């Protein structure tokens, strides 16, 4: 419901590698200039040292309803998750725990989770008291329609705290089950959660590891815990292989290798599952612009160029090839623009992106003649995943055409800039970082 860290960071003060102190963003909602704040958040200390942060804050909510939904099949719990989101309901939390985690938590805290359940969901909604009960009842209906065995509401703050104690203490409770555990942190589209959980179980069985699942189901962020003993060198090798295969499986399902734990060194080689060498070249160029001497947290995130990676090329999964094909297809549709840019660069000409021309009056006149680049040929829907509420469209698609496509599925892009009309392109929306009156509903 509230998004991730970058949605709440308004501004930063940071020290660059040469000692210069700079500010990015600030308390104003729409600072001018490039969004360096967005570049810094998530950079893992590789671009600068943050010394001061301005964040967005919210008032405490008026009412909270916390529910515990019980399931006999973990796949049914996963179905409830994406059906709730697909219904247009955004709980502030949707957390899942499977049978192994339930037992571990009950042994440690006695939270009242049913030990015979295959999975439980902790679902919490909050907001004004008026209407909140209706939202909770709709969630309960969806859960029962997806084979929930039982669902109950916490009666008071003490009961709510007890439910949350189990979730907060889950990792500590699991520590009693084995000398060590490997925490995976990969993400899949919500509709792929049942399949992802099946593959996690299959991989764990393949290598002979017990696995427990406790994770942020609402955004598809998996946390399989593989139990092992690091004193056993074979287990240590095998658990790394299993973790790698779980990441591969998530990428195969349209997900990614990390949801919130970052990349650092541990997942550096796995970056090749989701990025091409051209992608890395761009990221290395950004790193070099901030840190040309490579003094800040060197060697993190981006794998080195060449053949220095830990994983052999044969282990890189098929989705990279699929993505390469997708890029090839995109390049084919964008070929005229690519050719125009190459030609302009060779002749040292300036270029100016153009859509339908409806917003050409924004900004100042070019300081020198510029070659227009027409994006209107890029007007198709590239991929539309309605259940996961994601659409990818060409930059030349008009705002009106996009909204019309979405409305056929009872969806919309929640932006209505006052100066926009149906013929304006999505590219212009991005270029101007345009916003509308609904921004306040999304924490804006």
Question: Residues of each region from the PLM?
Answer:
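FAD-binding subdomain of flavoenzyme oxidoreductases
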Residues: 1-95, 296, 314-319, 415-416, ...
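Alpha-helix capping/hinge segments and adjacent helical runs
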Residues: 251-263, 288, 292-296
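Glycine-rich N-terminal segment of FAD-binding domains in flavoprotein oxidoreductases
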Residues: 216, 227, 250, 330-385, ...
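A glycine- and small-aliphatic-rich helix-loop capping segment at beta-alpha/alpha-beta transitions
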Residues: 5, 29-30, 53-59, 111-112, ...
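Intrinsic disorder at enzyme termini
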Residues: 276-337, 348
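A glycine-rich phosphate-binding loop feature that marks nucleotide/adenosyl-phosphate handling sites
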Residues: 95-107, 153-167, 216-221, 260-270, ...
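C-terminal substrate-recognition/cap domain of FAD-linked oxidoreductases
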Residues: 55-59, 65-242, 249, 253
């Amino acid at each position: 419901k509230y998004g991730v860290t970058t949605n709440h960071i308004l501004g930063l003060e940071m020290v660059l590698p040469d000692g210069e102190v700079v500010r990015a963003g600030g308390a104003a909602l729409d600072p001018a200039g490039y969004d360096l704040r967005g570049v810094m958040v998530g950079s893992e200390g590789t671009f600068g040292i943050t010394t001061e942060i301005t964040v967005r804050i919210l008032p405490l909510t008026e009412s909270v309803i916390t529910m515990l939904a019980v399931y006999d099949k973990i796949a049914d719990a996963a179905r409830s998750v994406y059906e709730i989101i697909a219904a247009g309901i955004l709980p502030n939390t949707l957390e899942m725990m499977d049978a192994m985690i339930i037992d571990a938590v009950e042994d440690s805290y006695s939270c009242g989770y049913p030990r015979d359940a295959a999975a439980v969901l902790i679902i919490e909604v909050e907001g004004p008291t008026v209407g909140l009960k209706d939202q909770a009842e709709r969630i309960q209906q969806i859960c029962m329609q997806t084979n929930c065995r039982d669902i109950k509401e916490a009666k008071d703050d003490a009961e709510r705290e007890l439910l949350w104690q189990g979730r907060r203490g889950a990792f500590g409770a699991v520590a009693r089950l084995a000398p060590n555990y490997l925490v995976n942190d990969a993400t899949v589209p919500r509709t792929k959660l049942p399949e992802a959980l099946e593959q996690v179980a299959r991989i764990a069985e393949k290598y002979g590891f017990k696995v427990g699942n406790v994770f942020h189901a609402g955004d598809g962020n998996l946390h399989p815990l593989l139990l092992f003993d690091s004193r056993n060198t074979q287990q240590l090798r095998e658990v790394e292989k299993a973790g790698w295969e779980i990441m591969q499986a998530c990428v195969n399902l349209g997900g990614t290798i990390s949801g919130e734990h970052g990349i650092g060194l541990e997942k550096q080689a796995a970056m090749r599952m989701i990025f091409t060498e051209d992608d890395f070249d761009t990221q290395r160029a950004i790193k070099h612009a901030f840190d040309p001497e490579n003094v800040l947290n060197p060697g993190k995130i981006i794998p080195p160029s060449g053949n220095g990676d830990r994983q052999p090329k044969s282990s890189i999964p098929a989705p990279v090839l699929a993505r390469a094909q997708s890029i090839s297809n995109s390049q084919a549709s964008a070929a005229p623009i690519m050719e125009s840019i190459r030609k302009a660069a060779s002749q040292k000409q300036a270029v100016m992106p153009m859509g339908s021309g409806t917003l050409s009056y924004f900004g100042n006149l070019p300081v020198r003649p510029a070659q227009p680049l027409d994006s209107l040929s890029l007007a198709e829907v590239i991929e539309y995943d309605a259940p996961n509420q994601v659409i990818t469209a060409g930059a030349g698609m008009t705002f009106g055409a996009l909204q019309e496509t979405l409305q056929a599925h009872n969806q919309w892009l929640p932006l209505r800039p006052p100066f926009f009309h149906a013929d304006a392109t999505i590219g212009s929306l991005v270029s101007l970082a345009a916003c509308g009156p609904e921004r306040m509903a999304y924490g804006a």
